[in-house]
Amino acid sequence: MFSWLLRIASACLGPARRYARTRKDEDGGDNGGGVADGLLWSRDLGRHAAGEFSFAVVQANEALEDHSQVETGSAATFVGVYDGHGGADAARFISDHLFAHLIRLARESETVSEEVVRGAFSATEEGFLTLVRRTQFLKPMIAAVGSCCLVGIIWRGVLYVANLGDSRAVVGYLGRTNKITAEQITRDHNACKEEVRQELISRHPDDSQIVVLKHGVWRIKGIIQVSRTIGDAYLKRREFALDPSITRFRLSEPLRRPVLTAEPSICTRVLSLQDQFVIFASDGLWEHLTNQQAVDIVYKNPRAGIAKRLVNTALKEAARKREMRFVDLKKVEKGVRRFFHDDITVVVVYIDHELLQEKNVSVPELSVRGFVDSVGPSRISGFDAIS
């Protein structure tokens, strides 16, 4: 049923080589399929200060646009999921700079707070816009590159989560009946949400084109679905206007005021004994799984490889929607694969409360990057200096 689409896509995009830095899914995955997926990378289980984590990424685009990181150490845990669009420049920039800004601001303030997190987002946005300003003459399309940004920090028993865009953090907690329950603690900044459209309309009452229904999808200015991002400079400042001959990003009139913002939604949660784990994932996962489905999978299965299990479950659902077999989907090359699903990043962070209460937990200071097999040292010791 899908062969006609695959042939068309292949003709348009051409053959593609495997991404060289993947740790390939050599055994065909943890939940069936029988064929290795060379576009799937995973770190099945690692340690953090308050428990364990599992990490997986699957590539769909010709060039992976998701960047991600987990920073571990004895003082804190940091998770970042950066879902790029229009290219990987913004997501890569966030991965290289946001955590450093967070450490610097936390040390200056001698605490971690919503204000510190907000400041780290602002500094990252300004840094990327400065990069756009410096390079736009040679690389004009960098003004159209942006990224969603989802960040989680666990510090002294408190979870701080901040997001721009439609990546999502979901807590799995035990309710009164001891049943695992999903609680989304982020807000989807996507024009498909009525409240987001109303927010945009209230900010732009004189712009009848601020949200447009195009081919059944609500888009801001008829172009983009997400309302809060890092980057997308041409939708924030007139100085970054693109050549109007570029039809994909053409605005019906010059920008009067920013139509996108980099103001994150922030949630602060004191972790309770009922909180079992947190799932951080780009929207590629949530396109195919509900919050409760994802939480049930994590709760009912072993920890090792759970992020990969979530990714594979989403891929199976993507295959089912296209009336194709999962084993056939895994044979589809990057680039062509984007016709079937998006890049997907998943980090599952387990909360072990006995560790959460300990003050002298010894955890290696490591920086784990999505789709990169080598593990480097982390700067997370910067949190140690906070009194």
From Swiss-Prot:
Quote the record's cofactor note: Binds 2 magnesium or manganese ions per subunit.
Can you say what this protein is called? Probable protein phosphatase 2C 25
Q: Which SUPFAM superfamilies match?
A: PP2C-like
Q: Which organism is it from?
A: Oryza sativa subsp. japonica (Rice)
Q: Which reaction does it catalyse?
A: O-phospho-L-seryl-[protein] + H2O = L-seryl-[protein] + phosphate; O-phospho-L-threonyl-[protein] + H2O = L-threonyl-[protein] + phosphate
GO MF, one term, reads: metal ion binding
Q: Which InterPro entries match?
A: PP2C, PP2C_BS, PPM-type-like_dom_sf, PPM-type_phosphatase-like_dom
- Give GO terms for biological process: regulation of intracellular signal transduction
What cofactor does this protein call for? Mg(2+); Mn(2+)
As for family, the record states: Belongs to the PP2C family.
